[in-house]
């Protein structure tokens, strides 16, 4: 990390130091002249994420920009230029020198964006998730026992999409975007790789993955410096995510409702 921050002067010298070209524009006062030395306006119109200088130099100046690229892909729905993706892949380990708090802030912004799946897929594809959220990447190597998806990773992304569909307006039962709900969606099956067992008939089981996953969730969220309440709520949802499976074909008994209410505590029923 650099000891000093240098400021460009004049304006055209400072703008190329920004993270992406779409953020490297300014209006010169008082005549409101657009200053766009890096072609940011054209990239904005094209929906392309590109760096003002080489992506390697930009990410070396501030490695958090690697995460920010994924966040903007999720937030804006932009395509990421191939050179930027290549640099993300090559320099992902540099994120290890960035404070967990800064990484967490970008991950939060990504998850509550309009297209979080897009950002997560970019993180996994470039290896950024191997550094920030390795449990998600590991799901690509785990078969979906229900054979509805290619692997548990694809299943997880589908669950994220479905969870977002459950979100409501501010006056509804699950006001969106709901960070706790979305975190639980992407983490609910992370216990499967550790609990995978193959039976003689060729089937695969993941007994206890809900409890193992809850512990793994708490550990990962603590490492990312999430607040205690978020850690508690997300890990509890992961632990309870199988609870409804036993009631798919039958009505809940009063005792089942009471047990769930006791175990879930203040978490809304609509979460699970």
Where is each model-derived feature located?
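Catalytic cores of the polymerase beta-like nucleotidyltransferase superfamily
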Residues: 1-271
């Amino acid at each position: 990390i650099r000891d000093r921050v240098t400021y460009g002067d004049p304006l055209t010298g400072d703008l190329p130091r920004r993270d992406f070209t779409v953020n490297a524009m300014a209006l010169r006062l008082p005549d409101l002249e657009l200053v766009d030395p890096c072609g940011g306006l054209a990239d904005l119109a094209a929906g392309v994420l590109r760096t003002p200088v080489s992506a390697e130099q930009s990410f070396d100046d501030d490695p958090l920009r690697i995460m920010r690229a994924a966040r903007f892909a999720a937030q804006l729905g932009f395509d990421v230029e191939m050179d930027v993706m290549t640099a993300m892949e090559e320099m992902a380990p540099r994120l290890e020198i960035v404070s967990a708090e800064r990484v967490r802030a970008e991950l939060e912004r990504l998850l509550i964006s309009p297209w979080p799946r897009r950002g997560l897929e970019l993180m996994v594809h470039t290896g950024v998730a191997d550094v920030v959220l390795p449990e998600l990447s590991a799901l690509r190597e785990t078969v979906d026992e229900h054979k509805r998806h290619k692997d548990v990773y694809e299943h997880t992304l589908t669950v994220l999409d479905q969870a977002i569909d459950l979100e409501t307006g501010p006056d509804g039962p699950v006001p969106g975007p709901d960070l706790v709900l979305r975190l639980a969606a992407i983490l609910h099956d992370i216990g499967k790789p550790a609990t995978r067992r193959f039976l003689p008939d060729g089937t695969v089981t993941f007994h206890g993955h809900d409890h193992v996953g809850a512990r793994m969730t708490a550990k990962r969220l603590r490492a990312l410096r999430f607040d205690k309440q978020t850690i508690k709520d997300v890990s509890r949802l992961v632990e309870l995510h199988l609870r409804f499976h036993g009631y798919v074909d039958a009505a809940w008994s009063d005792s089942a409702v009471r047990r769930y209410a006791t175990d879930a505590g203040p978490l809304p029923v609509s979460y699970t």
